[in-house]
Amino acid sequence: MIKILIVNMILLITQQLSAKDYDVRDFGAVGDGIFVNSNIIQHAIDYINAAGGGRLVFYPGTYVTGSFYLKSNVTLHIEQGATLLGSTNPWDYVKDPHVGWKSMIFAVKQDNIGISGKGIINGRGFTTANNMVKYIQKGLFDDPLKLDRPNETNRPENIYFRECNNVVIRDITLKDPASWNQTYDQCKNLLVDNIFVDSKSYWNNDGIDVVDCDGVVIKNSYFDTADDAICFKSHDANAICQNVVVDNCTGRSSANGLKFGTASRGGFRNFKITNLTIYDTFRSAITFAAVDGGLIENIVVDGLRSVNTGNVLFLRIGNRWSSGKTPSLQNVTIKNVYAEVPYAKPDAGYNYEGPVEDNPRNISPASIIGLPNMRIKNITLENIEMVYPGRSDTLYAKVGLTSKELDAIPEMEKSYPEFSQFKELPAWGMYIRHADDIHFKNVTFRALEQDYRPAVVMDDVKGASFRGVSFSEPNAQGKNQIFKYKSSGINIE
C-alpha cells in the first residue's frame, strides 16, 4: 500500500512541475494588502483551466481575497514573500451549497489540483470571526451564537476540497483560519508534504482534517493548533477513510495530537503512522474514537514521541450517533513509543488553551475502554516506555479497587469521548475495560513519585498477555501493579 501511494504521489508532483506558469498580476491582481482580488483570481483559474492547465503564480506581495474555486489541472503556486491574505469582511466568503461550509479556497469534484510554494495562506480568522459576531448581533446574519461564537460552518476555513482526485499540497504555510484550517473530504490520492500549520487564531482551529478519503500521504509537516492537530473523520456512514500514511510529522495541540474521530460514521482502515512527535498537548497524543457506528481497524503506529502531553493513548468505543450500527475497534498495533505525562497543565499559556476542569481527578492513565456489548479487540502495545508523575492525592480524588467502586465507574456510552471523561480512574498507567486480546510486549511503566493506584487495572478483560513488562515506582516494593477484576485468560510472564 505504502509503495503504491508514494509512486502515485511522485507522478503527481512531476506533473505539477512541468505545468505552464501564469503570473496572477497579468490578470490584474494587486498585491498591496488592500485590494480584494477574489474575482480576479477566479477569472485567472477559469482561464488556465480552459487552456488545459498550469500554475497560477503569486509573486511577492500581499493578495487579499475572499472565496474562490480551484479547478482541474490548476495549481496555485505561492512564492516565498507572497501571502494570500483572507479578507476580514465575512461577506466576501460564500458557503458552498454542496459542502455546507465557508472557505477561502474551495475545490469541488476537480482533478489534478494543488497548492505549492514557500508562501503563506493567512485567513486572519480572529478578526474575521469577530466581525461576523458584530453582524450577527446587528441581525444581519443568522446564527445562534452558541458558546458565544459563530457556528464553525459559518466561519471560513483556509482550504476545503471535496470529492477531488490527485491533490498535492506542498511547502506552504497555512495560518490563522476562522474555523478548521484545511479539510479534504472524500478525496482520492492526496499528498500533503512539508507544510507548516499555525492554527491558533480562534476556536475549532484544527490543523488538518481528512474526511472519508482514500489514498493519503501526510509527511514532513508541522502543526501547532488550538484544536486537534491531525484529525481523521468519517462523516458518511457509507464511506470510509482508508489507506493512509502519516510520516515524520510534529504536532502541538490544546486538544489531541492525532485523532481518529470524533465523527466516525463509516470508519477508518489501513493506516500506518510513523515517526510522530507530539508535545505541549492538552489531551491525548493519539485518540481512537469509534463512537458513531463506524469501524477502526488495521492501524499501525510505529514511532511516537510524546512529551509534556496530558495523556498518551485513548482507545474508545461509544454509542453516540450510531443509528443502529455497531461500532468496532480492532487490530491496532502501537510500538516504539516514548511518552512523558506531566503533573501540570501541559498547554498553559497557549492561545485557546484547553479548559480548566471543574471536577477533580488525579493524572489519568492511558486507557482502552469499550462497552459491555461492543468490545475493543486485538490491541498490541510493544516497546513502549510511559513516564507518569505519580503524586496522586486521595483527598483530591479516589477510586479504589473494591467491587462497589469499580462497578460505579460509568459507561458513558452517549458522551463525547475524551480521555478525562471518566474523571478519576483506578490506575496510574493503563486502564482497560470491556476488551479482548490485549497484548503488552516490552512495556515499561514509570512513576516518578508514589501513586496510591496500581499501574494497570483490567475490568472485564478476556485474554491479555504481559511479556517483558516492568514497573518503576518509588517506595512501592511488593506492590501488585497489575489488578484484575472480572477478567480471565490473563498471562503474565
Regions of interest found by a model, annotated:
Residues L11-L12, Q16-E493:
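Extracellular/periplasmic carbohydrate-active domains that bind, remodel
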